[in-house]
């Protein structure tokens, strides 16, 4: 787009206020998520790339939806209740909210604090979640477990135990080309309870099985926590983990899941959004900085616009847009601010008298304020 002298700030901010003004007085719909480590939020210390798919959900919904993720590492349907976690969630549920329920990985464990049996105690816990959610006017949705990356037959015991190991710690079993199930009847309980109680059921095991099987034993490692030694401070010795997801895996699976949700719950589906990249300071996106997202845009993508959602926060960055990065849209959440102190007292920081074209200089540097905004398009070329 052309940026004219003395007008860009006014035009941009005016447009953004119009977009965001409709959000102010509308009540949020909250999606509460309960489950285990494959769904949960993760600490970011040391560059930890592990993510639960539920952690990535905010980047797939409009700002009408608030995601409150209570899924926690190591929890089963039983321990989630006995530790008081469920009471904390259900006390906050209001009419029209959703509760996404996914357990199974740890219900399979043998220790008495977590173990439940499919068909009896596991099903009873799921029924409790459903009944108590409905009693508060909420809408329960049942999910079964995501697939473990198990290309070994018979199933390898270490995989079934969700083992995490460092590379070379022990010899791995030879993998084949067929993905084998490790969950057994624990996959059926959510399906059966959903049918019995008239609840929406999302078959996440099938969604993830099809994804992982389609990628194969080698490419599917890109979804999971396979970390080379010496690459990430959080795991100096590396990591080999066939259960837990990395950033790419969690974003990919969350995207497939929201599409399945939209297909079964149109009322929620109207809030679903897909972006090529999400930038978020809290780890709920692909990147922490806007510059990283711009760098990831494919070069000379002329016929397709690349969309980048910038989630709430203040991003102090000097944005450099190479001439090869064209047709980019930055979409800022309400409260997203992109700024750089180096430019604060300089004129022409919005590129006045500049039209960004393919043949322009190699880079263009912009300071962009997205306060109270929700849409910004940066376009190079036509």
Regions found by a protein language model. Give the residues of each.
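Right-handed parallel beta-helix/beta-spiral solenoid domain characteristic of secreted/periplasmic
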Residues: 281-283, 288, 301, 326-382
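Alpha-helical cap/lid subdomain in secreted, periplasmic
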Residues: 2-3, 26, 85-247, 251, ...
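Short, solvent-exposed loop/turn elements at domain surfaces
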Residues: 39-44, 77-79, 286-288
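Acidic Gly/Asp/Thr-rich repetitive segments characteristic of extracellular carbohydrate-active
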Residues: 277-309
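Bacterial N-terminal signal peptides that target proteins for export
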Residues: 1-10
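Bacterial Sec-dependent signal peptides at the C-terminal "C-region" and cleavage site
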Residues: 7-8, 16-28
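Active-site-proximal beta-strand/loop segments in catalytic clefts of secreted hydrolases
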Residues: 34-37, 69-75, 101-106, 143-147, ...
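Serine-esterase "nucleophile elbow" of acetyl-processing enzymes
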Residues: 23-71, 87-99
């Amino acid at each position: 787009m052309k940026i004219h002298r003395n007008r860009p700030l006014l035009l941009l901010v005016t447009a953004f206020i119009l977009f965001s003004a409709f959000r102010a007085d509308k009540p949020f719909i909250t999606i509460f998520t309960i489950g285990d480590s494959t769904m949960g939020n993760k600490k970011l210390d040391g560059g930890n790339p592990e993510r639960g798919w539920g952690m990535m959900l905010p980047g797939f919904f409009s700002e009408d939806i608030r995601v409150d993720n209570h899924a926690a590492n190591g929890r089963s349907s039983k321990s989630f209740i006995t530790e008081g976690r469920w009471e904390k969630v259900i006390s906050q549920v209001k009419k029209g909210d959703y509760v996404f329920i996914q357990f199974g990985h740890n219900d399979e464990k043998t220790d008495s604090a977590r173990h439940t049996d499919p068909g009896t105690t596991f099903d009873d816990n799921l029924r409790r979640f459903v009944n108590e959610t409905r009693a508060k006017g909420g809408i329960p949705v049942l999910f079964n477990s995501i697939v473990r990356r198990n290309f070994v037959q018979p199933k390898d015991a270490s995989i079934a135990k969700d083992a995490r190991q460092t590379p070379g710690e022990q010899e791995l079993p030879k993998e084949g080309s067929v993905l084998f199930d490790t969950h057994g009847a624990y996959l059926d309980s959510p399906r059966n309870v959903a049918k019995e109680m008239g609840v929406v059921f999302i078959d996440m095991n099938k969604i993830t099985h099809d994804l992982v099987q389609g990628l194969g034993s080698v490419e599917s490692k890109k979804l999971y926590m396979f970390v080379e030694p010496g690459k990430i401070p959080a795991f100096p010795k590396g990591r080999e983990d066939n259960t837990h997801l990395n950033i790419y895996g969690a974003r990919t699976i969350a995207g497939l899941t929201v599409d399945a949700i939209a297909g079964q719950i149109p009322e929620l589906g109207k809030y679903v959004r897909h972006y090529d990249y999400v930038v978020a300071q809290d780890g709920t996106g692909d990147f922490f900085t806007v510059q990283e997202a711009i760098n990831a845009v494919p070069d000379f993508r002329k016929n397709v616009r690349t969309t980048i959602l910038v989630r709430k926060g203040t991003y102090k960055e000097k944005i450099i847009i190479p001439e090869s990065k064209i047709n980019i849209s930055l979409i800022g959440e309400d409260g997203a601010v992109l700024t750089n102190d180096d430019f604060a007292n300089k004129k022409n920081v919005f590129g006045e008298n500049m039209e960004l074209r393919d043949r322009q200089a190699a880079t263009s540097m912009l300071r962009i304020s997205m306060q109270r905004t929700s849409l910004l398009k940066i376009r190079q070329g036509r």
